[in-house]
Regions:
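Mid-domain beta-loop-alpha active-site segment that forms a flexible
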Residues: 4-25, 68-70, 145-152, 197-204, ...
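Central helical "cap/lid" subdomain
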Residues: 57-102, 223
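Active-site lid/adjacent beta-loop-alpha segment flanking the redox-cofactor pocket in flavoenzymes
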Residues: 98-190
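Helical element adjacent to the flavin cofactor pocket in flavoenzyme catalytic cores
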Residues: 5-62, 70
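Short strand-coil-strand connectors
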Residues: 52-54, 95, 108
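C-terminal catalytic lobe of FAD-dependent flavoproteins
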Residues: 15, 154-235
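Active-site catalytic microenvironments for nucleophilic, acid-base chemistry
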Residues: 25, 29, 77, 215-219
């Protein structure tokens, strides 16, 4: 080991609980959420925009593009090509064990993220690739990636040698060519705002949303986001 860092206030959250909690809070503030509602087209409409969706057309004066790996597809509807890609990766969960790891373990050199959930199951990841399937939004588990990921995890936490796996699931994460977020108003498309954070969307989502809300409301964002404008990709 060449070096390490310890962050005593490093946090972790269960997205299966955190995401519905955010949605419930938004509804209490007046938001209307349309689940499983795909945007199939987006175009200027008078002084605003019109989105064609599975629930019918929706008109809005302002649009926030926070579609993750699909953000590039949405921006392309407005004639703006952004280097946003979806990458299939996978995560493994084990049976419950005694408490061993109280914090998030991040092993950059070995491609490993590892933590224990509240019920003491281990969650093992690290960006290992899943397989692409016929449906781009439905990746499949890659057995070789699973074995390689577990090899690193067992080296770092030997207790895993006697722990059974329960399941493995793949998903799509979003990335940009320069690994930087895309935030702020889309150049040449007034009223359209980007809120896209690559690779760590769940972690950075709340702050990205806060900064985006400030910009949408015409306020100066509390952090300077000029370097993250989509203008860096546009001629």
């Amino acid at each position: 080991m060449i070096g390490a860092a310890y962050c005593p206030d490093e946090g972790k959250a269960n997205p299966l609980k955190a995401t519905p909690a955010f949605a419930a809070a938004a509804r209490r503030l007046g938001a209307r959420i349309l689940a499983n509602c795909e945007v199939t087209a987006l175009s200027p409409d008078g002084g605003g925009y019109r989105a064609e969706t599975g629930a019918g057309p929706i008109r809005a004066a302002r649009v926030v593009n926070a579609a993750g790996a699909d953000a590039g597809r949405i921006s392309a509807m407005l004639g703006v090509d952004l280097p946003i890609e979806g990458h299939p990766i996978q995560v493994t969960v084990t049976e419950q064990a005694e408490p061993v790891v109280k914090h998030l373990v991040y092993f950059a050199g070995g491609k490993l993220t590892l933590k224990q959930a509240k019920n003491c199951s281990f969650l093992i990841g690290g960006g290992w690739s899943a397989r692409r399937s016929a449906r781009a939004d439905r990746p499949a588990v890659d057995p070789q990636s699973l074995l390689s990921n577990l090899r690193v995890a067992r080296h770092v936490v030997p207790r895993l040698n006697s722990t059974c796996l329960l399941r493995v699931w793949p998903a799509i994460v979003n990335g940009t060519a320069d690994w930087k977020p895309i935030l702020g108003e889309l150049p040449g498309r007034p009223g359209v705002f980007m809120s896209m954070f690559p690779w760590m969307g769940f972690t950075a989502g709340p702050m990205s949303a806060l900064l985006t809300a400030e910009v949408v409301l015409g306020r100066k964002p509390r952090l300077d986001i000029a370097a993250f404008s989509a203008a860096r990709y546009m001629p």
